[in-house]
Amino acid sequence: MVAENQYYGTGRRKSSSARVFMSKNGSGNIIINKRNIDQYFGRETARMVVLQPLELFDMVSKVDVYVTVKGGGISGQAGAIRHGLTCALMKYNELLRVDLRKAGFVTRDARKVERKKVGLHKARRRPQFSKR
């Protein structure tokens, strides 16, 4: 399924999961769910998060990236794509792992939404205490 010059990585963040395919001989095209990165992410911060691993090694214009992402919101999807792209970069060249680890991209952010508990308004918000 994955071609010789393609590298695959799976990324997850919150409730989002991304499948990232990276082609090493590219021109800098980043396609997310069949749309350009500028069309898919309206927020500049989300675009910056996605491009962080590539900018670390000045590879933004050297590779093509094709992504399918589902679940969650804008921030979670951007984080999932970054994690998947990091995994794909490590398959491309294992020597990049040290710098990616130092930048904090390798570790999966395990924080998820805490569940609502019975008797509370939200996950931790208690009902107002009344002395009398």
Curated annotation (Swiss-Prot):
GO terms for molecular function: RNA binding; structural constituent of ribosome. Belongs to the universal ribosomal protein uS9 family. One of its GO terms (cellular component) is cytosolic small ribosomal subunit. It comes from Baumannia cicadellinicola subsp. Homalodisca coagulata. Keywords: Ribonucleoprotein, Ribosomal protein. The lineage of its organism: Bacteria, Pseudomonadati, Pseudomonadota, Gammaproteobacteria, Candidatus Palibaumannia. One of its GO terms (biological process) is translation. The keyword Transmembrane does not apply. This is Small ribosomal subunit protein uS9. Pfam families: Ribosomal_S9.
